Amino acid sequence: MVSFDVDGTIFRKAALTQATRSLGIGEKWDALDQMYHHRRITLRECLASEYKLLHGMKLADIIREVSKVEVIKNVRETVEKLQGHQIRVILLTDNPDFLCAYLIERFGFEGYVGSKVGIKDGIVTGEIETLPDKRLGLRKYCAWTGIPLSRCAHVGDWVNDVPVFRIVRYSVALNAKTEKVKASASHHIETDDLLDVYHHFQSIN
């Protein structure tokens, strides 16, 4: 199984952060990000507070803005090539499930592990269950599917991918933001084409 991070990996920038600027909540969203980066709130608190800002919004409006955010080249092609080798391809992210559902529909991913944000009649509700610990999320998913971590690879770009890198068999830091992330992965790649990751997997197999 191969899992892909979302922001900075599939999307070139943080998708919801970009979308909120057109939705009128960009300043509040950015302020929460800053509080987290200055360690005044935890990641769990940051995610919960950010997702509360979406309460009452139309899902269609959010997805419309998200769809404008640039994605890395050849996502569907990479997913399909991996699936051609009977490899399950999923998303592993702290982003909401509705964002994962959009990417599954657009690119053909087979599943996701992410935060849960309620939607009723096309409107975002206040029901929120965040996933600040992607490692825990992947462990649960592996237990549910019966796929051992020793048969998993993860592709990501940020510090919250590092704990995942440490428990899977193989990891790729893709366009990683820091040396720590690069050093924590089995391999690191700088590219604007996701097929380069597929070709790397082929070369090590």
Task: Give each language-model segment a name.
Residues V75-F107, G111-S115, F165:
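Substrate-recognition element of Asp-dependent hydrolases with the DxDx(T/V) motif
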Residues M1-R44, A48-S49:
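Active-site neighborhood of HAD-like aspartate-dependent phosphohydrolases
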Residues R44-E77:
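Metal-dependent phosphoesterase signature
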Residues K120-G126, V181-H188, Y198-S203:
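Short, charged, surface-exposed secondary-structure boundary motifs
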Residues V89, T93-D94, S150-D192:
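Acidic, Mg2+-coordinating phosphoryl-transfer loop and its flanking beta/alpha structural elements
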Residues S115-K120, A176-K180, D193-V197:
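Short, acidic/turn-prone active-site loops that include or flank metal/cofactor-
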Residues I63-R76, L92-D94, G114-S115, G126-P132, ...:
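Conserved beta-strand/loop elements of the cytosolic catalytic core of P-type E1-E2 ATPases, chiefly
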Residues A101, E105-C152, V162:
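Substrate-recognition "cap/lid" segment bordering the active-site pocket of phosphatases
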